[in-house]
Every structure is written in C-alpha cells, then in structure tokens.
C-alpha cells in the first residue's frame, strides 16, 4: 500500500530496473497503478488485451512524462501473426516476441518458427527494438542475434547454471 500511495519505492529501487510483463486482461485499465510502481519497462501482451480496437489509441495517448520514465512494449505469442503488431510499432518502444507457447513455464524449448516472425518484423521495421522471451539459451540466443534481435530474456538458462554470473557474462558476449 505504501508503494501504491507513492510513500516508498519498490525494494532495491535504485539497484534493479523492474520490467512488468503484463499478461493480464486488465493491463490497460490499471496502467496508472503499474506506472506508480516505477518500472523501467512495461510490456502488454497483445493476446490478453480485451479491446484491441482501442489499444492503439491507448498507446498513442500515453503522456510524454510517462514515456520519458519508461519504455512501452507489446508482446506476441509465437503463433500470433506478426503483422498484428505492425499498426502498433509506431507507438511502442519495442516489440517482444515470445519464444515459447506455454508462457510462464521455465525450461521450455525455443520455437524455431519465431525466427521467421523476427525476420519479417525487422524487414518491415528495421529500427524497431526486438526482444525475445522464452526458450532463450546460448544456442537459441546466437540464432536470435543473427536475425537481428536486440534483447534476450532468459530465466532457466541463467538460474539453472552452476555459475550464474559466468552465464550472464556468456550471454553478454553474444
């Protein structure tokens, strides 16, 4: 409650950049609550958005103060037609493509079909930042970097490693 009332920040506020991956149906309606928590990035999952017709208007209407304080991204699942995000690219800071179908599951195998979606997106919008989350390990990460991915999001490949810091360094070297 103190965080929502802006009397204090998130734990480790100054040490960690928080990213909110909003796989919830009320993300747009509660956006002001999420912004009060001070994330560096907010990601809306397109498949969870109830009112897609007005979603672009919502993104365009985010004020410049909020835009300066955080990055706004839109995520799509591997089986979603990548062209569905084309109308949203101009009002987002990045697009996140999920690398797995079972979102939220650790250790899932990367869906190789995602590479074609990335190529299509980069051909149409070469300047857009692309992030991939799910199934990202050093092998898939290398392939993703080859097709133009800017950010890799990895959980189990890092946290299951015996040397977590060493694994992070390996990812940074990709």
Each PLM stretch: what is its role?
Residues 30-84:
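Hydrophobic, well-structured mid-protein blocks that either form specific transmembrane helices
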Residues 1-20, 58-78, 112-136, 170-174:
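Alpha-helix-loop-beta-strand connector modules within alpha/beta enzyme cores
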Residues 26-36, 79-92, 136-152, 166-168:
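Catalytic cores of alpha/beta
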Residues 42-51, 96-107, 147-168:
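Glycine-rich phosphate-binding active-site loops on the catalytic face of alpha/beta enzymes
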């Amino acid at each position: 409650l103190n965080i929502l009332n802006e009397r204090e920040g998130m734990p480790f506020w100054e040490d960690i950049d928080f990213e909110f991956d909003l796989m919830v149906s009320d993300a747009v309606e509660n956006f002001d609550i999420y912004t009060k928590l001070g994330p560096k990035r907010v990601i809306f999952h397109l498949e969870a958005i109830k009112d897609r017709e007005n979603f672009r208007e919502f993104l365009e209407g985010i004020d410049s103060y909020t835009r300066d304080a955080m990055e706004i991204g839109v995520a799509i699942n591997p089986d979603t037609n990548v062209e569905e995000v084309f109308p949203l690219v101009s009002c987002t800071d990045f697009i996140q493509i999920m690398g797995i179908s079972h979102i939220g599951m650790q250790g899932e195998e990367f869906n190789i079909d995602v590479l074609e979606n990335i190529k299509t997106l980069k051909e149409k919008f070469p300047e857009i930042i692309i992030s991939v989350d799910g199934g990202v390990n050093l092998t898939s990460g290398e392939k993703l970097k080859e097709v133009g991915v800017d950010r890799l999001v990895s959980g189990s490949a890092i946290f299951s490693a015996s040397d977590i810091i060493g694994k992070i360094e390996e990812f940074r070297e990709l």
